[in-house]
């Protein structure tokens, strides 16, 4: 389903089908999402759901479907709380989509006309809060703080003391022995190796600036801010995803990086070919890494 909505987002921008299929593959099987997609552990399921729900929220924001967009966003937050950071980007897309149809409307006009569309989101959020309070006596607690690895930790689940080591792991290649990479079983590895779409996004930003092309600078900066804040936030977590291959917590950022990339894609497919080796590198690393994870 996530791949379907990835393709639908690309087609919304009138990108030809061949290119749309390629970038759908780059985001999915060419990234560390390939690892999480094959695993039925409950936290992997939650992350896969957040991935798809975030893409659905983005798609319906582009289509000016406020109710659906924010409802799916609320569901994504329920799966992965840091998806709450996507809200400014969704509101920006919704605002632009509404203005394309109603150019004279101001923000207050949009609110007056469409406030009822917020009801599904509010109901979903309220249901989460009621459930959390009933189970743990706290509307924001959903059980993670009660896991043994966090209750036994002196610093708890989140602490800035974890950030330095986690940031280092996030940008480090695996250690080598005899010229061969050693398998990284936990705590993450270089995000540019396991999810090369991060490289694609940065290159397309540089391309747009170098060529002095017109692009949505506000949205580009917004996407960068969301990605950076979420990256730093997850590095404050004790485990960075526990046992897995790659760097699965950073997979939560893939949907926002994807829409940021799509916005910057040139209409003439210029520079598309540089993504091909990135895709094959991402596919090979994640395929081999995923197989080794399950056979070890």
What are these regions (language model features)?
Residues 1-296:
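Membrane-proximal envelope and lipid/glycan-remodeling enzymes
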């Amino acid at each position: 389903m996530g791949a379907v909505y990835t393709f639908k987002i690309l087609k919304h921008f009138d990108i030809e089908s061949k290119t749309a299929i390629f970038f759908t593959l780059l985001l999915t099987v060419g990234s560390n999402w390939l690892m999480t997609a094959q695993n039925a552990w409950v936290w992997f399921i939650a992350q896969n759901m957040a991935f798809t729900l975030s893409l659905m929220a983005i798609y319906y924001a582009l289509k000016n479907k406020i109710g659906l967009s924010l409802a799916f966003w609320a569901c994504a937050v329920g799966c992965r709380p840091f998806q709450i950071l996507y809200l400014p980007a969704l509101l920006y897309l919704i605002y632009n989509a509404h203005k394309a149809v109603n150019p004279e409307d101001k923000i207050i006009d949009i609110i007056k006309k469409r406030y009822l569309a917020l009801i599904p989101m509010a109901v979903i959020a309220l249901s989460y809060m009621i459930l959390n309070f009933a189970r743990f006596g706290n509307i924001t607690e959903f059980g993670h703080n009660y896991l043994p690895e966090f209750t036994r930790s002196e610093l708890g689940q989140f602490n800035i003391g974890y950030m330095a080591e986690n940031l280092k792991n996030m940008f480090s290649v695996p250690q080598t022995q005899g010229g061969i990479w050693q398998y990284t079983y936990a705590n993450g590895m270089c995000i540019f190796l396991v999810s090369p779409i991060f490289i694609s996004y940065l290159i397309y930003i540089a391309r747009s600036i170098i060529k002095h092309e017109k692009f949505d600078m506000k949205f580009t900066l917004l996407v960068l801010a969301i990605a950076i804040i979420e990256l730093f936030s997850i590095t404050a977590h004790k485990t960075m995803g526990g046992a897995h291959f790659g760097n699965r917590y950073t997979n939560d950022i893939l949907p926002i990086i994807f829409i940021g990339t799509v916005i910057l894609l040139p209409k003439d497919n210029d520079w598309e070919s540089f993504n091909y080796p990135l895709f094959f590198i991402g596919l090979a690393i994640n395929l081999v890494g995923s197989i080794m994870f399950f056979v070890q």
